[in-house]
């Protein structure tokens, strides 16, 4: 493990992703599985690869990810956030374009808590006039 590697932590909803960028040929491994087997949907794979495609570093780094918590969309967003942070650590000149695309900003939207007297966060029990 004497190779140069760049670390980045990404978060989205309840998901946390620990990302390592290692010089390589663009292979993405998530929880020791290929990206194609981990994410069935093409849209999620596109979300994960967005920062690499935007900066033109897709073929320069192998991406090793450890992600837990949340669902598929949250995990994809967390991985994108982690990759972006690691890319900025590798090359500070990439910061402006990644910031402009909004990848450096942690998405603050979280699940709203359930309130008592209601069925869900905002869903009220059915109203009966009589």
UniProtKB/Swiss-Prot annotation:
It holds the Pfam family Ribosomal_S9. This is Small ribosomal subunit protein uS9. Residues 99-110 have a biased composition (Basic and acidic residues). Keywords: Ribonucleoprotein, Ribosomal protein. Residues 111-130 have a biased composition (Basic residues). GO terms for molecular function: RNA binding; structural constituent of ribosome. The gene is rpsI. GO terms for biological process: translation. InterPro entries: Ribosomal_Su5_D2-typ_SF, Ribosomal_uS9, Ribosomal_uS9_bac/plastid, Ribosomal_uS9_CS, Ribsml_uS5_D2-typ_fold_subgr. One of its GO terms (cellular component) is cytosolic small ribosomal subunit. It comes from Clostridium botulinum (strain Alaska E43 / Type E3). NCBIfam families: PRK00132.1. Residues 99-130 are annotated as: Disordered. Belongs to the universal ribosomal protein uS9 family. Transmembrane segments: none annotated.
């Amino acid at each position: 493990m004497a190779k140069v590697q760049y670390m980045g932590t990404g978060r989205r909803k309840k998901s946390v992703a620990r990302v390592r960028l290692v010089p390589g040929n663009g292979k993405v491994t998530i929880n020791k599985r290929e990206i194609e087997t981990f994410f069935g949907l093409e849209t999620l794979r596109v979300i994960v690869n967005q920062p690499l495609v935007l900066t033109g570093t897709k073929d320069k780094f192998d991406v090793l990810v450890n992600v837990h918590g949340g669902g598929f969309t949250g995990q994809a967003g967390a991985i994108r956030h982690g990759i972006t942070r690691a890319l900025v650590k590798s090359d500070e000149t990439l910061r402006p374009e990644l910031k402009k695309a909004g990848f450096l900003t942690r998405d603050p939207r979280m699940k709203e808590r359930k309130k008592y007297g209601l069925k869900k966060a905002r869903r009220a029990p059915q109203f009966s006039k009589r």
